[in-house]
C-alpha cells in the first residue's frame, strides 16, 4: 500500500477512472492502517543492524551516524566510533578499537549518487576496491586506526524519466542524498 501524494494527483483522472476511485486529491487527516508508529518503534529497536553488519570476514558500515558500536568480530570484542554530520557534511570520521592487530576487510558504503569520494587511513590516502556499492579496505587493522571518508556532495539536477508522462519536463535539485522540495506556489 502506498499513501496518496496529493501533489501528484489529477482529480479529474480519479473521478473518471473507476480504478482510481480510492485516490484522494487531498491529504487525509488519518489513515485506517496506521503503520507509522509501530514501524518507528521497530526502526529504533533494529537501527544497530542497519548501521553495521558482518558477513564472513568483512565488517560493513552501511549508514553514517555519530555513534559508538560494540560487537564481536572474529571472536573478539571490537568497538567502532563514528563522528558524522552526514548528510549535511561530506566528512565521516571512524575509529576502531581492537584488542589486538587483526587482518580483515572493512567495507564502507559509497552511495550511488556519489561520483567522487576518497578515504584516508591514519592520514594517508587509501584506494580500496569498489564493488556493489561498498569500498573494501583490506589490511591489518590496529587499535586506534582512523578512517576518514569524504563523500563529495556537489549540487546536481536530476531530470525525470521522460517515459513517465506525468513527470515530463520535471527536475529535482539534489545535494548528496537530500532531494530539495519546491512546491507549486514556489515555482
Question: What do these predicted ranges mean?
Answer:
Residues 104-107, 137-152, 156, 183:
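C-terminal beta-strand-rich structural cap/linker in extracellular carbohydrate-active enzymes
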Residues 1-110, 114, 118, 130:
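Aromatic (Trp/Tyr) and acidic
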Residues 1, 151-187:
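Glycine/proline-rich low-complexity spacer/linker segments in large multi-domain proteins
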Residues 99-103, 122-131, 143, 187:
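Short, glycine- and charge-enriched coil/turn segments that flank and shape catalytic ligand pockets
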Residues 114-138, 157-163:
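Solvent-exposed beta-strand/loop surfaces of large extracellular or lumenal domains
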Residues 89-91, 132-134, 144-146, 170:
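A generic structural signal for beta-strand entry/edge sites
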Amino acid at each position: 500500500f502506498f499513501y496518496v501524494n496529493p501533489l501528484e494527483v489529477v482529480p479529474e483522472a480519479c473521478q473518471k477512472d473507476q480504478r482510481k476511485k480510492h485516490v484522494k486529491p487531498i491529504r487525509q487527516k488519518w489513515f485506517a492502517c496506521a503503520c507509522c508508529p509501530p514501524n518507528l518503534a521497530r526502526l529504533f529497536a533494529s537501527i544497530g543492524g542497519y548501521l553495521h553488519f558482518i558477513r564472513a570476514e568483512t565488517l560493513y558500515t552501511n549508514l553514517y551516524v555519530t555513534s559508538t558500536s560494540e560487537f564481536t568480530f572474529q571472536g573478539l570484542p571490537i568497538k567502532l566510533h563514528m563522528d558524522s554530520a552526514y548528510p549535511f557534511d561530506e566528512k565521516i570520521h571512524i575509529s576502531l578499537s581492537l584488542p589486538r592487530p587483526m587482518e580483515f576487510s572493512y567495507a564502507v558504503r559509497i552511495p550511488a549518487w556519489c561520483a567522487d569520494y576518497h578515504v584516508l587511513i591514519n592520514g594517508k590516502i587509501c584506494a580500496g576496491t569498489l564493488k556493489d556499492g561498498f569500498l573494501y579496505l583490506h589490511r591489518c587493522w590496529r587499535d586506534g586506526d582512523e578512517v576518514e571518508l569524504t563523500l563529495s556532495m556537489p549540487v546536481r539536477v536530476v531530470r525525470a524519466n521522460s517515459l513517465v508522462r506525468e513527470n515530463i519536463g520535471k527536475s529535482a535539485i539534489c545535494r548528496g542524498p537530500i532531494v530539495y522540495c519546491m512546491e507549486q506556489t514556489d515555482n
